[in-house]
Amino acid sequence: MCIRDSQSAEEAAGFLAQHVMYVNPLAVQKVAAEFLENLFDDLEYEEKNRASTGFSLIIHIGFMIERIIANKTIIFDHKTPYLDSNKEIFQKIRSHIKSIEEAFEIEISDDEICYMMITLYPNTYDAAVA
């Protein structure tokens, strides 16, 4: 399934249009969908989960960019043990996320990536910090 052309991506952009001030939702949709297609392929992410997870992540990415532009930060609790337990996933996201950083001229923190990881793999947090 192509995230770029999916109804989920369009719905996410529509949602963002109502809730963000500093970013263009259509630009977020385009860049985030391309990022996700490459990431999903690299992670060998299950096809059946791509649309729903893609929707959630496009919204997360839109709000993330908005936070970064507004100079607001979020903190991810237990970041060090979580990253230690999920290095491979983190490294793949970190390598692909450069496309978003370049498109919007921003730097994305490890904390933001951790929240993406939990959206992709919800069960990884409890296992890592237990």
Please tell me what each predicted stretch does:
Residues R4-A130:
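A cross-family "folded-core" feature that marks the main globular domain of proteins
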